[in-house]
Amino acid sequence: MPFEASALDSVARETRPFAAELEPVDWVEPSEMVIHSKQYRVMGQMGEGGMGTIYHAYDPVLERDVALKVMKPGLPGAARQRFRMEALYGARLSHPNLARVYDLGFMPDRGLDWFAMEHLRGKDLDRLLARARQRNMRLSFAIVAHVFGGVLDALEHAHRRGVVHRDVKPSNIFVCRDVEDGRIWSKLLDFGVALDLARHKGPIEICGDPRYIAPEQALGNRPLDGRTDLYAAGITLFELVTGRHPFHDLLEAPSRDLLAAQCERDVPRPGNLLPAAVSKEVRYGLDVVVQRACDKDPDKRFASAADMRTAMLDVLRGAPERHDMTAA
């Protein structure tokens, strides 16, 4: 029921004295810098990456737990730039399937950069896959659809903003549980080698994990775009549904052999490695999704992460589950 005009007039009269107290302050100029000093109480070490050590910390001002990533000492200037860019991307890209970055700073007494980010409780997909293999099991199709669907959502968000991740792989996908509602979430992490297509000028540095790198990323023979990430996503999807890497025979070989395989060998059909209980329709559907994502020619891959997500969900959502395909 709409308010009557007289009622609105009454509210306006009652709030006018309060509004008068909220006149713009004149002791802070628009061009001034507001300087603050943040302090975090370190609770313990959580993990370690190539460029930094991650600590569980507590923010006493906002009364919340955070993950504090501190850059390792002695790294070259290029590594420091990557470290800072990881934080900037985390603050700039806001999506439920990306970890939020709260703050970025510098420790002058130690000469180390740091940033504070969302504190996540869970495990990365690499660990979950290893645990499933130890038990001779696979992740369920339902888990793959939910977890990896979120990753593709995050990639779509980044790609629409001109950011290519360049390091999509299971160890950079974190599976966590929301402490408030108990829901499972996936978070795409580590934008340390990400590429901003709008800002980057000149030659592109070749970087990435040989186990997941796209041919054009390894060779540096053509411009990169979001479809570069879809190749790595296809390799990851193969690993999630089969429990093993498509080029598992080369994982202990020199990196050059693995890079050659990424550029020259077709990715196997995942359907051939699935249990007999999986229907022909699901096998064929997964073959199509993975092989299209992993085509050596970027122009033949999915046009977007959203398209790949739709195709994957069309296959997996109707797939029946069996206990011998579920990792506990």
Where do the language-model regions lie?
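C-terminal lobe helix-coil module of Hanks-type protein kinase domains
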Residues: 160, 174, 211-327
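Conserved short submotifs of the Hanks-type protein kinase catalytic core
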Residues: 110-124
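Activation segment signature within eukaryotic-like protein kinase domains
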Residues: 147-148
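Conserved N-lobe ATP-binding subsite of Hanks-type protein kinase domains
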Residues: 53
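Short N-terminal regulatory/linker segments that flank and modulate the kinase catalytic core
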Residues: 1-44, 135, 275, 314-315
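Protein kinase catalytic-loop region centered on the HRD/HxD motif
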Residues: 151-163
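AlphaC helix of the eukaryotic protein kinase fold
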Residues: 72-92
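Activation-segment/catalytic-loop signature of the eukaryotic protein kinase fold
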Residues: 104
